[in-house]
Amino acid sequence: MTMLSIRRANVNDTSEIETMVAGFVKGHPAEAHPRSSNALRAAFFGEHPVAHLLVAEQGSEIIGMAQWRLVYDMFWGMFGAEAGWLYLKPRFRGSGIVAALVARLCSEASEAGARFLQGGGGEGPSRLYERIAIGQSDRVCHLSGKAFQLFATLDGLPVREIVRRLPLKEFGLQPAD
């Protein structure tokens, strides 16, 4: 199996990102909506990026992506991260790579001061989120407390090890150390 790497996306990845967006949007009402390469580049690689975009690579192929941005929760009085646009090419799904992307996302967000992760999604990522995070009926899930802290430490481990070490959902109710 080719080594997995996760890194920050850069402007040279634009074409691959657009290909993944085209796969991601299939079946959505926006499927036929035109999307501008310039707008994508400005959104993630311009003067004021809207979020941090990560890509997963195996060999020289970009196979997945996820974005995160720093948020502030006024109820809890702390910074967190909001995850979005988590996508993995279909032939790589079920391999634990999504967990590796989320681990890197938690690691980067933690370094930026985040103490929790919130996000949601379709059936695929929601299975992971519902396994490790505390969710509401609106399918927005929060990975927080000790669970968030533990997930951040999984960054860089082999995919199978990340999946084996996934924190218990209940750890999201415990304060981080």
Region locations from a protein language model:
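Conserved beta-strand in the GNAT
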Residues: V55, E61-L70, Y87
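Conserved acetyl-CoA binding element of GNAT-fold acetyltransferases
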Residues: G77-P90
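A short beta-loop-alpha structural element at the N-terminal edge
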Residues: S5-T19
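Conserved acyl-donor/pantetheine-binding loop and adjacent beta-alpha core of acyl/acetyltransferases
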Residues: Q67, F75-G80, F148-F151
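Conserved active-site alpha-helix within GNAT-family acetyltransferase domains
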Residues: R115, G122-K146, L150
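Conserved GNAT-fold acetyl-CoA-binding loop/helix
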Residues: E18-A43
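A short helix-loop-beta-strand connector motif used in the catalytic cores of GNAT acetyltransferases and
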Residues: F44-V55, E82
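Conserved acetyl-CoA-binding loop-helix of GNAT-fold acetyltransferases
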Residues: L88, G94-S107
